[in-house]
């Protein structure tokens, strides 16, 4: 895999209580909870609890295009600094060969990701400690301040494609 075994430290997300909370937050509207649980080697119930602790609404149907050739780049970018390659493969549902090809051949994606794969330790579920629970409650409180509906209303991804397909008067 390109850049495998790199030593560049991954970007940290200090506004999240820990990496597992960041992982759930960044993927909640893109990847089904069952797949997130598989990546974290835990139950779907634990993933749902992490999400709820940050004030995220229960998942609605996740569009399948996030794992196809149109959407996987978004998922990959959101997790490049969170997960090692093996867990990215699980998250994306790709083989090593498929991901290697996409990184090198698909629009020079590896170059756009910085020409390096940051060093990421495997991410496994751990029951949140008191500090993590306080951090998640702070995020929940912030969502309450701004109004939860502001974050729940999303225009469907790639909806602009349908707009382009409509005949113009």
Locations of regions flagged by a protein language model:
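Mature N-terminal, pre-catalytic/accessory segment of carbohydrate-active enzymes
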Residues: 1-169
